[in-house]
Amino acid sequence: MKVVTVCGMGFGTSLMLLMDVQAIGKKHGYDIQGEAVDLGSAKGKECDFMVASGEIASELDGESVEVVAINNLLDKEEIERKVMPVIERVAKGVK
């Protein structure tokens, strides 16, 4: 499955989120490919779901895939709690 992680510039925050999401997926037996991008590049990207900070996620309304909003980017438990249900739905083919 493929995730797109999004931040304002497409470097720091989105790359950190991508590594966290991939590690969480691996921990639960899922292979997650991904791309870290800036907000402008995210719109219309081909993926199964997106992950972004709460502020950025609100800018992604209207995307055809689910956008997971993370409030505390340093809270790995929050990331796992919010991302795992989406990973499991995508793995089952449920959108």
Q: What is the role of each PLM region?
A:
Residues 42-46, 57-66:
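Short loop/helix-cap segments at secondary-structure boundaries that form the rim of catalytic
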Residues 37-41, 46, 78:
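Short acidic active-site motifs
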Residues 38-39, 52-58:
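Short, polar loop motifs at secondary-structure junctions
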Residues 34, 47-53:
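Short, hydrophobic beta-strand segments that form beta-sheet elements in well-ordered domains
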Residues 66-95:
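Ser/Thr/Gly-rich flexible loops in soluble cytosolic domains mediating phosphotransfer, phosphorylation
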Residues 2-41:
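Conserved active-site segments centered on acidic
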